[in-house]
């Protein structure tokens, strides 16, 4: 009975609410719109697998087409717009003739320039064609212009090819050119296109930060998600073929510096220029080089020498690699420091708009640590003085452009430290005391104070000024008239001594540090960085970060 009632109720509702044609049409329209939106979303999803595979397949098809069809017109255009340059090769063993022949097989009228620092020996047996050997070290009877590669490159684009590469067709080089041209309007910051040479080594796409002021180069693995067929990088390694505009190449300070193209990537990073890496494409490798121990050693030694020369020219002292390893290219214990004699308290690097090289700062920190340990062990009280105390208050470290460390000690405690006693004794005989760690101790020639140097060759140092109390005032026997902070001060600032963060440790310092510094330097000295003698610089003296 209940089922019959329910059925009757449903029939009544259906009769009272009939489905109209408009409702049917509306429902169909909604369904169609949903299907269209789904389709459009699927097609336009540039990160989707379908788009990526389709785009890559199209490129591969284009390359395959070039291998089987006569692409005369694009080839002729490539020949007229591009110069092929060889810069990275070894004169004692190379695959240059075969590499050039493989290019001429596909681009018989291409202009090829081979650049060598000195005339190659044994002589290169280059094939016939439009090939120019440019020797950068010219003979006395030659014009200077004859050794300048830019005088032989007249095309709009230049392609750098490493040694021992094979061109299998015209299509990949032609595609590189079209990709570079397309970037001019789409991504103007991309001015280099790179294609790797097929090797067992994984291709690396790195970010690159060149801090010129701090002499530091920092690499990191690019975490940018790869596009369908390319990646955007600051630096690419290992071997690759690169294409770029000639005008951009010649706008760099050292366009033909080796190792290449790393030298270009470093310089380009200063202008925020990116490289488009076609990481799913590759050129075929040629003849395997440096297969015996002797030639491998010669090659590795040459690369090391060129790398050192490149960093010297670019002013790089510290390189942080993607692995976290750090390489140093500055001064050491057995070399001189990175800068010469300082005049007017202004080191030469300040006139270059640079700060203290990081290797020098590290050696100053090491020397300070070493000295503080010795003084603490001997029971000699010390405190940070002058710019070193200012650096501690402002940065917890040495001022980034400072070139030494200054401390004060109590004169009556000098005899407690055997190293200072040795320095005094050697000073009387006109020599310096070198301890068993290689540090050099001396009585300074400039006045009545002591100095510890990083080594007998590297004169980065800590100055040790003996003070004594007189009528409640700390004074000393030697003063520097050009240092406004070099003045007497109340002995109460040393009663008691406090500690402050400096070079990674807790160092001794006067009490009421801010008050002490403003007494010596002036109001607001901590918050207002300034070079020691700013009037010597034409630009503003206020330091910008």
Please report, for each region that a protein language model flagged, where it lies by residue.
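Active-site nucleotide-donor binding segment shared across nucleotidyl transfer reactions
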Residues: 372-405, 415
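C-terminal catalytic/acceptor-binding lobe
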Residues: 29-34, 53-70, 229, 236-239, ...
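N-terminal signal-anchor transmembrane helix specifying type II single-pass membrane topology
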Residues: 2-63
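Short, acidic, metal-binding catalytic loop of nucleotide-sugar glycosyltransferases
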Residues: 78, 98-110
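Conserved catalytic core of nucleotide-sugar-dependent glycosyltransferases
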Residues: 168, 172-252, 432-467, 474-482
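Short beta-strand-to-loop acidic/aromatic patch adjacent to the donor-nucleotide binding site
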Residues: 154-169, 408
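Conserved catalytic core of two-metal-ion nucleotidyltransferases
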Residues: 23-31, 35, 353-376, 424-520, ...
């Amino acid at each position: 009975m209940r089922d019959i009632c329910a059925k009757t109720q449903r029939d009544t509702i259906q009769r009272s609410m009939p489905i109209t044609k408009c409702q049917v049409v509306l429902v169909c329209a909604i369904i169609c719109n949903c299907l269209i939106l789904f389709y459009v979303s699927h097609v336009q999803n540039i990160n989707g697998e379908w788009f990526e595979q389709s785009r890559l397949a199209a490129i591969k098809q284009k390359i395959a087409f070039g291998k089987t069809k006569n692409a005369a017109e694009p080839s002729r255009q490539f020949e007229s717009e591009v110069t092929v340059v060889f810069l990275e090769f070894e004169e004692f063993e190379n695959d240059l003739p075969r590499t050039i022949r493989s290019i001429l097989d596909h681009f018989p009228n291409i202009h090829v320039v081979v650049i060598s620092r000195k005339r190659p020996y044994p002589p290169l047996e280059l094939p016939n064609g439009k090939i120019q050997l440019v020797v950068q070290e010219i003979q006395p009877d030659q014009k200077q212009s004859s050794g300048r590669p830019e005088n032989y490159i007249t095309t709009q684009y230049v392609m750098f090819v490493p040694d021992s590469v094979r061109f299998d067709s015209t299509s990949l080089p032609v595609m590189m050119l079209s990709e570079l041209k397309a970037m001019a309007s789409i991504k103007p910051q991309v001015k280099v296109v790179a294609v790797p040479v097929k090797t067992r080594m994984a291709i690396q796409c790195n970010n690159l930060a060149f801090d010129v002021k701090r002499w530091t180069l920092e690499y990191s693995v690019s975490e940018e998600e790869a596009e369908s067929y390319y990646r955007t990088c600051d630096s690419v390694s290992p071997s690759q073929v690169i294409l770029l505009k000639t005008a951009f190449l010649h706008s760099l300070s050292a366009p033909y510096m080796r190792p290449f193209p790393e030298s270009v990537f470093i310089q380009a990073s200063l202008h925020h220029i990116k490289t488009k890496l076609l990481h799913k494409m590759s050129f075929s490798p040629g003849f395997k080089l440096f297969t015996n121990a002797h030639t491998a050693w010669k090659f590795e030694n040459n690369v090391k020498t060129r790398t050192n020369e490149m960093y010297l020219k670019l002013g790089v002292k510290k390189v942080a690699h993607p692995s976290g390893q750090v390489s140093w290219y500055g001064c050491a214990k057995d070399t001189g420091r990175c800068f010469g004699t300082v005049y007017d308290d202004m080191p030469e690097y300040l006139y270059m708009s640079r700060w203290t090289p990081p290797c020098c700062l590290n050696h100053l920190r090491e020397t300070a640590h070493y000295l503080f340990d010795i003084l603490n062990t001997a029971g000699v009280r010390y405190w940070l003085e002058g710019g070193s105390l200012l650096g501690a208050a402002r940065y917890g470290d040495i001022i980034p452009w400072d070139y030494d460390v200054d401390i004060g000690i109590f004169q009556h405690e000098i005899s407690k430290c055997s190293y200072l006693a040795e320095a005094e004794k050697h000073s009387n005989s006109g020599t310096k005391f070198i301890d068993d760690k290689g540090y050099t101790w001396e009585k300074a020639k400039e006045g009545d104070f002591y100095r510890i140097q990083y080594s007998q060759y590297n004169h980065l140092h800590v100055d040790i000024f003996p003070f004594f109390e007189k009528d409640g005032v700390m004074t000393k026997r030697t003063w520097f008239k050009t240092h406004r902070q070099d003045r007497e001060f109340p002995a109460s600032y040393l009663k008691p001594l406090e500690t402050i963060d400096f070079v990674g440790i807790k160092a001794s310092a006067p009490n009421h540090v801010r008050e002490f510094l403003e007494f010596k330097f002036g109001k607001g000295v901590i918050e207002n960085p300034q070079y020691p003698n700013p009037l010597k610089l034409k630009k503003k003296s206020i330091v910008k970060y």
